[in-house]
Amino acid sequence: VFLRSGGTSAGFSLDWRHSDERTERELTTELRGEIVTLTPVTEAHVPDLRRIRGTAEVGARWGSIDDSPTWPFDDPTTTCFTVLEGGVVRGFVQYGEEEDPMYRHASVDLFLDPAAHGRGLGTDTVRTMARHLLHDRGHHRLVIDPAVDNDAAIRCYKAVGFREVGVMRGYERDTDGEGWHDGLLMDLLAEDLT
């Protein structure tokens, strides 16, 4: 399952504000699912995350890790978490937030170690993050945009309650930089979460 793009989240609510400033509490929030724990990315996680992102299967979706020497700390507009299973690094999930009150929503991207596929970690990761964004961060709508041929990810997102909105033609540059591929826009409203 290549997820680009249960349990309950932490037992407290976070206030959202119209700002890119993150509080210490937001940056240290640990989210617990039925199988996974999502914890803010630390320097200690980076070697494992870069190894996973560097696998052929994940790299085919996310691009070369060599193109991003400061990843995962290169985008201040996203909040990044490490996916842990029993303390072992299994993947990465990030979210971004549109703060304009007329369009407020969050977007999610993630990947998992190919060695951990088929055990429900993807579904638990997406569900855990969705609960956090809907309940703790105050969003009513989430979006995710897998490649149209990423059947495993699409199945995972649908299992959590995401619905297909439509195909975005020529949406994303191919990882080889030679062409473009279509993306599938999917969204989830708070009442859709399973």
Give a label for each model feature.
Residues L14-W71, L189-T194:
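A short, well-structured alpha-helix characteristic of acyl/acetyltransferase catalytic modules
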Residues T78, H181-L185:
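Short hydrophobic/aromatic beta-strand or adjacent loop that forms the aromatic wall/cage
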